[in-house]
């Protein structure tokens, strides 16, 4: 047996088996790209991952990400017990939407800088889709044209390290991305994450998230926001605040803070999970409960 503190500092026993945590990645970043964050979380959790959303032919990308939600739910159903859901960007949003559809599969949800597009922004985005402007007004247009082939891994490393966004990553984080994001081909290496899938995901960002905000969310949900996240400013925080209430904390960093500060991200994620699980147990039983039971 092990021990854990409740919210009232009362020590109670819990089984030594680690709580089940499922992590879902952001668009264009296979789950292995988050190696440093996930290794840190593995100290306390049984971490499972979705490798690359949108690449299973059974779940082709469709509008409002409904098939990506189906894909995640299909994986969660194999566990036989509810999991703690954590996801970055795309992954956090899909995790939240999966938990909304199937709350029996989730203990709580932690969203890492994920888009919750609601209100007037959702209406503008819906109209843009109807007018055929989705590719022009999303990063999908850039994704389709981005370079994805290099003569060697070293050349790919030099390419990414020349960009300020990757220079801000923690030591070793770019190696994780290349180790899990490249595959060999006859003339060098290429990105595993298909550019067309990436573009399709961007251009099908849900415009219907207001539906999940109408009633109290069925499981506890929290949000960790990057203070310098351009993507979060574009999506807005109004919908996020309606969704998570007081369960919102910030971290100094951009949208890619899980790669910039993996250790701090893991720490804040642990703290948020503890808060959310306690809220869930108190709601069910009317008493404080083990944070990592």
Residue ranges and their predicted role:
Residues 253-266:
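Catalytic histidine-centered segment of alpha/beta-hydrolase-like enzymes
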Residues 144-203:
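Conserved alpha/beta-hydrolase catalytic His-Asp/Glu region
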Residues 82-124:
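Conserved hydrolase catalytic core segment
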Residues 48, 52-86, 116, 125-128, ...:
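Active-site loop/oxyanion-hole signature of alpha/beta-hydrolase fold enzymes
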Residues 22-26, 88, 225:
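The conserved beta1-alpha1 loop
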Residues 108-149, 233:
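Flexible "cap/lid" loop of the alpha/beta hydrolase fold
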Residues 17-59, 81:
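Conserved HGGG/HGGXW glycine-rich cap/lid loop of the alpha/beta-hydrolase fold
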């Amino acid at each position: 047996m092990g021990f854990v503190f409740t919210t009232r500092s009362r020590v109670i026993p819990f089984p030594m088996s680690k709580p089940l945590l499922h992590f879902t990645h952001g668009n264009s970043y296979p789950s292995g790209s988050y190696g440093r964050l996930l290794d840190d979380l593995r100290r306390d959790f049984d971490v499972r991952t979705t490798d690359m959303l949108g690449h299973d032919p059974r779940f082709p990308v469709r509008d409002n990400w409904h098939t990506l939600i189906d894909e995640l739910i299909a994986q969660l159903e194999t566990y036989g017990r509810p999991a703690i859901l954590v996801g970055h960007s795309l992954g956090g949003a899909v995790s939240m939407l999966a938990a909304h559809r199937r709350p029996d599969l989730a203990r709580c949800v932690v969203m890492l800088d994920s888009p919750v597009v609601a209100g007037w922004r959702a209406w503008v985005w819906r109209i843009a889709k109807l007018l055929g402007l989705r590719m022009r007004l999303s990063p999908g247009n850039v994704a389709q044209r981005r370079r994805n082939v290099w003569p060697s891994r070293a050349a790919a490393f030099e390419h990414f390290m020349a960009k300020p966004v990757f220079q801000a990553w923690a030591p070793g984080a770019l190696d994780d991305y290349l180790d899990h994001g490249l595959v060999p081909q006859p003339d060098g290496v290429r990105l595993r994450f298909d550019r067309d899938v990436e573009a399709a995901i961007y251009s099908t960002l849900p415009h219907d998230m207001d539906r999940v905000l109408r009633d109290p969310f069925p499981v506890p949900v929290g949000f960790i926001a990057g203070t310098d996240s351009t993507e979060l400013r574009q999506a807005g925080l109004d919908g996020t605040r309606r969704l998570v209430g007081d369960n919102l904390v910030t971290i100094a960093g951009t949208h890619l803070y899980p790669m910039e500060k993996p250790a701090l991200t893991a720490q804040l994620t642990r703290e948020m999970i503890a808060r959310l699980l306690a809220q869930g147990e108190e709601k069910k039983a009317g008493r404080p409960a083990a944070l990592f039971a």
